[in-house]
């Protein structure tokens, strides 16, 4: 993975420091032109008035199984519910509707109920796990020339969410194997479960099956 990039514009794409901005090496929206991403544009469409003002860091993924098989397309983003927050506190999940393929928001969850892991760096994969035990795997969909940089932004975000303190976040230049180690421990627990239970815990993201979230 490429490291040591220059500091990026502010979280949410403002490009300047301001309320809610992450102080050190802030993240930027995953759209190289600075144009709002699909999820941001969807929220601006007027259907979700309470979410219109959220600044979102988002990327496009495909959901994959533990064996790497592609299940469906997913857009995942994080947002801060208040400009006073230094870090995002909400996770948003969206995907194409079965009827017309238009983007559909089918999950908004407090990040306190979610764990994010680096699942496979070489394949740009993250693992998302809820406190209920439900888990799924997402592989980044991005142009080859920007994929490493964009995945690196998610890794930095994971660090901030995991290690942020009143004194500031842990520097992102350090090795992030700790994130992978935590995920490995979680995988060891999974291996002790019968195959049927493992399959039941691996959630398929489907806007028509909201009961999968259990939240």
UniProtKB/Swiss-Prot annotation:
Residues of the region (Disordered) are 1-20, 174-215
GO:BP terms for this protein?
Answer: defense response to virus; innate immune response; positive regulation of type I interferon production
Q: Where in the cell is it found?
A: Golgi apparatus
Compositional bias ranges of the Acidic residues kind: 178-191
**InterPro entries recorded:** GARIL-like_Rab2B-bd
Please give the GO cellular component terms listed in this UniProt entry: Golgi apparatus
Keyword annotations = Golgi apparatus
Origin superkingdom: Eukaryota
Q: Which family does it belong to?
A: Belongs to the GARIN family.
User: Could you tell me what this protein does?
Assistant: RAB2B effector protein which promotes cytosolic DNA-induced innate immune responses. Regulates IFN responses against DNA viruses by regulating the CGAS-STING signaling axis.
Subunit arrangement? Interacts (via N-terminus) with RAB2B (in GTP-bound form).
From the Swiss-Prot or TrEMBL record, give the protein name.
Answer: Golgi-associated RAB2 interactor protein 5A
**Which organism does this record belong to?**
Bos taurus (Bovine)
């Amino acid at each position: 993975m490429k490291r040591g990039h220059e500091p990026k514009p502010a979280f949410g794409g403002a490009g300047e420091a301001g309320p809610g901005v992450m102080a050190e090496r802030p993240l930027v929206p995953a759209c190289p032109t600075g144009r709002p991403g699909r999820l941001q544009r969807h929220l601006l469409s007027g259907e979700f008035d309470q979410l219109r003002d959220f600044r979102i860091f988002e990327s496009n993924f495909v959901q994959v199984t533990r064996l790497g098989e592609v299940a469906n397309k997913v857009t995942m983003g994080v947002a801060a519910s208040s400009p006073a927050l230094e870090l995002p506190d909400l996770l948003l999940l969206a995907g194409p509707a079965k009827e017309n393929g238009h983007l559909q928001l089918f999950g908004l969850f407090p990040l306190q109920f979610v764990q994010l892991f680096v699942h496979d760096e070489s394949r740009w994969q993250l693992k998302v796990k809820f406190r209920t035990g439900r888990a799924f795997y997402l592989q980044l969909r991005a142009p080859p020339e920007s994929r490493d940089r964009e995945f690196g932004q998610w890794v930095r975000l994971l660090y901030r969410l995991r290690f942020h303190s009143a004194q500031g976040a842990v520097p992102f230049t350090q090795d992030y194997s700790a994130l992978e180690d935590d995920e490995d421990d979680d995988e060891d627990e999974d291996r002790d479960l019968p195959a049927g239970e493992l399959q039941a815990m691996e959630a398929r993201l489907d806007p028509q099956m909201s009961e999968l979230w259990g939240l």
